[in-house]
């Protein structure tokens, strides 16, 4: 059986092993359930208000006040808290990925940082390049610093040939990059999974709503108009929630994937410049 994975190779199973991920999902569900029952399901949102509780009127018989969208969403049924959970998880991990990628970028603009490194390397100013990495911080700076330290060591190593030194420098870059990139793509699989399952959960709610609607039509005599309207409303609300979650999931996944691709390109560009500089200066 195949597993959902993101471009960094992380599967949904790996993501769910994280205590942070599990805590976010559980907390999101509890918040969604609380909002659904206590805020959306508050009797003041329905015709009759507090009298609905006093008269013990079943919640499926409650009728939303005109224009009260909280009550309308509440009538979407028990699938609504699941869809709200999906949205909360999506928002949480979108923010988490944004913070992580911002930290990985470091303190300054990456394009300026890469150009400065290229200038330092062209003039064989290795110490200045290392100092720039310490100032920039972030994943790209970490990779470049590892390469620059190896560069400095190889310059003084007389036991290796030029080709061996170049291979050693390239290997150092590959190892440093392999340590940094997984951090950027971690939990990205959560966003891609939400993009896939949100619309399916919404479809489940749609089916349940239509079952209720057709059940009202199947009654002998005049159909129950209230039950029919409730069923159709439930179906449409779940459809809207499901599509919204899927749409946002796709947008956020593609947005962060593009940022990671751009980040990876800058790492490759800077690494290539360092190797070329070393090859040109090494005799």
PLM features: residue spans?
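Hydrophobic membrane-targeting segments
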Residues: 7-110, 256
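Predominantly long cytosolic amphipathic alpha-helical stalk/bundle segments
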Residues: 5-10, 65, 93-95, 99-100, ...
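Residue-level signature of catalytic and energy-coupling elements of molecular machines
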Residues: 77, 91, 129, 144, ...
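Helix-termination/interfacial motifs at the ends of transmembrane alpha-helices
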Residues: 8-16, 36-56, 62-63, 72, ...
């Amino acid at each position: 059986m195949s597993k959902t994975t993101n471009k960094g190779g992380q599967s949904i199973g790996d993501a769910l092993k994280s205590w942070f991920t599990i805590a976010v999902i559980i907390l999101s569900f509890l918040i969604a359930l609380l909002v659904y029952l206590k805020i959306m399901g508050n009797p003041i949102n329905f015709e009759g208000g507090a009298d609905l509780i006093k008269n013990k009127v079943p919640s499926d018989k409650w009728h939303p006040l005109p224009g009260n969208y909280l009550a309308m969403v509440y009538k979407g049924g028990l699938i609504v808290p699941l869809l709200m959970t999906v949205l909360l998880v999506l928002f949480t991990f979108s923010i988490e990925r944004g913070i992580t990628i911002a930290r990985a970028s470091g303190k300054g603009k990456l394009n300026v940082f890469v150009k400065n490194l290229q200038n330092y390397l062209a003039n064989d100013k290795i110490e200045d390049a290392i100092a720039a990495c310490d100032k920039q911080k972030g994943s790209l700076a970490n990779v470049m610093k590892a390469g620059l330290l190896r560069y400095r060591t190889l310059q003084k190593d007389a036991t290796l040939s030029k080709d061996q030194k170049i291979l050693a420098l390239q290997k150092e870059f590959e190892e440093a990059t392999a340590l940094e990139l997984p951090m950027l793509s971690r939990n990205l699989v959560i966003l891609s999974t939400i993009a896939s399952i949100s619309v399916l959960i919404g479809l489940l709610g749609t089916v349940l709503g239509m079952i209720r609607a057709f059940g009202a039509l199947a009654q002998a005599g005049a159909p129950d108009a209230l039950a029919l309207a409730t069923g159709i409303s439930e179906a449409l609300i779940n459809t809207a929630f499901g599509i919204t979650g899927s749409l946002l999931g796709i947008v956020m996944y593609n947005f962060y994937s593009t940022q990671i691709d751009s980040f990876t390109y800058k790492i490759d560009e800077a690494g290539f410049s360092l190797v070329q500089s070393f090859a040109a200066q090494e005799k």
